[in-house]
Amino acid sequence: MSNLPFTVAALYCFAPLPQYESLREPLAQLCCANGIKGTLLLAAEGINGTVAGSAGAIEKLIAHITAIPGLGEPELKYSHASEMPFHRMKVRLKREIVTMGVEGIDPLKSVGTYIAPKDWNALIADENTVVVDTRNDYEYAIGTFEGAIDPQTRTFREFPEWVKQNRDRLEGKKIAMFCTGGIRCEKATAFVKGLGFDDVYHLKGGILKYLEEVPREQSVWNGECFVFDERVAVGHGLAESDVELCRACRRPLTPQDKLSQFFEEGVSCAGCYAERTPEDRARYAERQKQVKLAEKRGANKHIGS
């Protein structure tokens, strides 16, 4: 049991929800009434999101979600935070609960073989296994599994094209995929199986479940795991890390990254300096000045973020 005051729940469930629009308002009201913040996505294919609040509030929300007709038990990962990691609550209606942009992909019909965290090391140690990180390049940059391929994608929409262009690296291999919490791999493995590959596997519960269950001394994970909230990243045991966000481009920054000559808090980092004009950086510098003034007044320190 954690002593940290906020419970963070990452959840998803693929299930037919033809009336998903009607679920939005009750969910939003429940979250607002119980001080829950974060994001929930609803689509005809299911629900996905990460939220935070008191343990009791999150328990109420999960009970509400589980009781939605036709939904069933969501895939859940719990962690904890010292501060509220979200600024507001959003319940959004979407075409997909995780956007791949490929028509006809249905994880309920065909998906890879789930591998429990305790069995993951053995699978990826097999010399006939190719390990694929389905996340984005900025996530890979701060942590991944030993020997994992980086597809160098900026968004998940780019992943299908990477697979098509790299079929020769996958042919005749066991294909082991992983992502943060498991949802991207539901679609990634379904897509790859649809291309005719048979030996397709994915880490059940994703990196978060692995870091929670596998002891550090047995782990083959290197670095930190990027998360899409103000914690930025977590490590073994889902402990909060010292990774921060560049407030100009929202890339994750390690303490080493902040030593770069191109790093200026709130203005630029080595990753985005060349992508921005001097006018952009001047604007960001003014925003950062306002952030610091707001901090002195005790106001929101994340102006414009």
From Swiss-Prot:
SMART domains: RHOD (SM00450)
InterPro entries, alphabetized: Rhodanese-like_dom (IPR001763), Rhodanese-like_dom_sf (IPR036873), TrhO (IPR020936), TRHO_N (IPR040503)
Domain of life: Bacteria
GO biological process: tRNA modification
EC number in record: 1.14.-.-
Domain Rhodanese: 125-219
Record-linked Pfam families: Rhodanese (PF00581), UPF0176_N (PF17773)
CDD domains, A to Z: RHOD_YceA
Residue runs in coiled coils: none
Residues the record marks as active site: 179
Catalytic activity: uridine(34) in tRNA + AH2 + O2 = 5-hydroxyuridine(34) in tRNA + A + H2O
GO molecular function: oxidoreductase activity, acting on paired donors, with incorporation or reduction of molecular oxygen
Keyword tags: Oxidoreductase, tRNA processing
UniProt KW Oxidoreductase keyword: yes
Family of this protein: Belongs to the TrhO family.
NCBIfam families: PRK00142.1-4
Described purpose of this protein according to its UniProt entry: Catalyzes oxygen-dependent 5-hydroxyuridine (ho5U) modification at position 34 in tRNAs.
Record-given protein name: tRNA uridine(34) hydroxylase
